[in-house]
Curated annotation (Swiss-Prot):
Organism of derivation: Schizosaccharomyces pombe (strain 972 / ATCC 24843)
Full protein name: Protein lsb5
A single GO molecular function term of this UniProt record: phosphatidylinositol binding
Keywords: Cytoplasm, Cytoskeleton, Endocytosis
Entries under SUPFAM superfamilies matching the protein: ENTH/VHS domain, GAT-like domain
Family according to the record: Belongs to the LSB5 family.
Domain (VHS): residue spans on this chain: 20-149
Location of the protein in the cell: Cytoplasm, Cell cortex; Cytoplasm, Cytoskeleton
Length: 304
């Protein structure tokens, strides 16, 4: 090793990524993402190590491993939190993503997924701290690619997506319960909910779940699943509305909480609209963040 070579720490982050990109994993398998996210957040260098390892997978690995690297990258963006978002991006990763999207040496599934991810970042992450450069990559795509890729309708396989929906409904219910219970325990006249870090964590969880629910409500036609998704969405909306009501009751909310909330949860895309409790389906659903970014109607097959 040369005297000017960078010393690269190898931790559990690299070990997890190696395991999650192995050839015996399914393309869309998201098991292990929670553990990887925790490992990334354990150290200051975790996000950069993850970025570097994924970039090398995209450059040197097989098509399957490249797809897996893209899956993991998007899952980390959506689940690893602000520490990852604000520290993972660099010029080398940006250039590699463009290569994945435009270079014919990459397989069609890799190119298609990379294009969808770049478009997603532009649509949903332009105002997210740490994602400024990644969200601007769309301007560097060839015009044909930057304007294409919405014509194909995703194929919905309920057998495959069923477990994902179950997890989403359960996690949404838990998020709504956590936020609602935490709001009951405070006095809005003396404590601003938007200044309570734990409440803000629950609020962020609800916002993420809400956008995922909207995406599935728009896509799912099965009446049983749709009813369960709408019920979960109602719980989330009730909790979020309660948070806003508590904030409005606080005497200094109008002057203080806005700046705190925006800085603490800046990564949220508040463009997502609430779906009415009386909605019969996905007609009012807006574009939203999908917890399972790589399922047939996830972010790489964006629903308009």
């Amino acid at each position: 090793m040369g005297i000017f070579s960078e010393t690269v720490p190898i931790t559990a982050v690299t070990t997890y990524i190696d395991r999650l990109t192995s050839r015996d994993t399914d393309d869309e398998d998201l098991s292990g993402i929670v553990q990887l996210s925790e490992a990334v957040n354990l150290t200051v260098t975790g996000p950069r190590e993850a970025s570097r390892t994924l970039r090398k997978k995209l450059k040197y690995s097989t098509p399957h491993e490249q797809v897996r690297a893209l899956v993991i990258l998007q899952a980390l963006i959506e689940n690893a939190g602000s520490h990852f978002l604000q520290n993972f991006s660099d010029e080398k990763l940006e250039d590699r993503m463009l290569q994945c999207a435009t270079n014919s040496e990459y397989s069609k599934p890799v190119r298609k997924r990379a294009i969808h991810m770049i478009k997603l970042w532009h649509n949903d992450y332009s105002n997210v701290r740490g994602m400024e450069s990644m969200s601007s990559l769309v301007s560097r795509l060839p015009q044909r690619q930057s304007s294409a890729s919405h014509s194909e309708q995703p194929t919905i396989n309920l057998k495959k997506v069923g477990p994902i929906l179950e997890r989403l409904i359960a996690s949404s219910s838990m998020a709504a319960t956590n936020l609602s219970n935490s709001l009951v325990r405070i006095n809005p006249n003396t404590e601003n909910p938007a200044k309570n870090k734990q409440i803000m964590v629950y609020y962020v969880d609800c916002k993420r779940a809400h956008r995922s629910l909207l995406r599935y409500i728009q896509a799912i036609q099965d009446e049983m699943w749709l009813a369960n998704l709408l019920k979960a969405n109602d719980e989330i909306v009730t909790a979020i509305d309660a948070f806003k009501e508590k904030c409005s009751e606080n005497s200094d909310y109008s002057s203080d909480s806005g700046s705190y909330s925006s800085s603490y949860s800046r990564h949220l895309d508040d463009r997502a609209s609430y779906i009415s409790r009386s909605s019969s389906g996905g007609s009012n659903a807006q574009r939203s963040e999908d917890l399972d970014v790589n399922n047939p109607f996830g972010d790489h097959n964006r629903l308009e």
